[in-house]
Amino acid sequence: METGAVTGILNTTLAVVFTWVGYKTARIVWKYTPYSYPNARIKAMEAKLLSEQRFNELAESRTLNNFVVSLEDTDYKDYLASVSNYTVEEIERALERALAGTYELMVTILPKRVNPFFRLLLEEWDVRNITSVIKAKMVNEPASDYVVEIGTMLPKVKAMAEAKTMEEILVILEGTPYEEPYQKLLLGEISLKEFETELYRMYYAKLLNYALSKKEDERVILEEFVRLKIDKTNILTLLRAKAAKMGAEEIKPLIIPGGTIKLDSILHVDDLSMALAELDSTRYGAVIRDVREEVERDLSVLERALDRHIRERMNELTRFYPLSVATPLSYILQKEREVRKLRAIAKLIDDGVEPERIKELVGDAA
């Protein structure tokens, strides 16, 4: 073979190799670099999350004034600055605003290709607020007491809380995805529980569709997160229904599609104990076994265990995919837990509960 031909082949081969290397390098840069700054910032924020020792110190506050003062060296300081009367309601609102600020920060600092997911996560608070307001209205309770100041449609939610009639709420919801389900509720075509399920079904469908539209690591992480949340919702719905002696046909409309576990066999068991036994063979078996005895007396124990399982799973994914969307998801879950615990401490202090008992109760609430 002539020297020129050999040189040509070598040049072509080198060009192909360098093109491939360049492509792979560009893919790595595109995939990981956008997470470098936000994840470093989130890790720094994670280091500031309150320790168990700090929660115990807060439990010793005895007054809400002291509780607020004790948080002045934390990221809650600016949100608590508006507290003047030191009521538990004021403090809860401030903590809710702090949590909302965390969601908003994620939307701001994360790559554009994933930050819409965090906007969608805020819609869960819309669903919670809408259902809470309507439940309160139906039993003639002050609906504004149940509004959490987080979500994408807070002004509408507050208007709903102030509405004089149930029909007025329909006008407020006009043009939103919630208009049609609410109209069915007003007409008596669906029950309040079915209305709530429909809103969650719509919410999780949005999340899952978004997750499935992603590729590679982002799809793996987002899909796992959404399906875990759906599983948690379905398991708790099913067990509460079994505790209430509901039949399979009554429960089916309350199940949200998109979870990882098959529920058909569990739907047809006779009671809560048998349902727990059926769940033992699923991926959640170990979680349930750890709290089995307590669960039969108090289902909130399982809710906390499932929340903990989801947090642990996101932490695992954070270690496996350090420069990924797993880090902000893990942080959001930890922040939600922190705010729940702070709200619980504030409420217990307001109720005059002794510090040692507060520590026990808040530790259980983790």
UniProtKB/Swiss-Prot annotation:
Q: Which domain of life is it from?
A: Archaea
Q: Name one GO cellular component term.
A: proton-transporting V-type ATPase, V0 domain
Record's InterPro entries? ATPase_csu/dsu_sf, ATPase_V0-cplx_csu, ATPase_V0-cplx_csu/dsu, V-ATPase_V0D/AC39_subunit, V-type_ATPase_csu/dsu, V-type_ATPase_csu/dsu_dom_3
Kindly state a single biological-process term from the GO annotations of this entry: proton motive force-driven plasma membrane ATP synthesis
- Keyword vocabulary terms for this entry: ATP synthesis, Cell membrane, Hydrogen ion transport, Ion transport, Membrane, Transport
Is Ribonucleoprotein there in the keyword field?
Answer: no
Q: Which GO terms describe its molecular function?
A: ATP binding; proton-transporting ATP synthase activity, rotational mechanism; proton-transporting ATPase activity, rotational mechanism
Gene3D superfamilies on file:
ATP synthase (C/AC39) subunit, domain 3, V-type ATP synthase subunit C domain
What function is annotated for this protein? Component of the A-type ATP synthase that produces ATP from ADP in the presence of a proton gradient across the membrane.
Entry's family note: Belongs to the V-ATPase V0D/AC39 subunit family.
Its name, as the record gives it, is A-type ATP synthase subunit C
Lineage from the top down?
Archaea, Methanobacteriati, Methanobacteriota, Thermococci, Thermococcales
Q: Gene name, please?
A: atpC
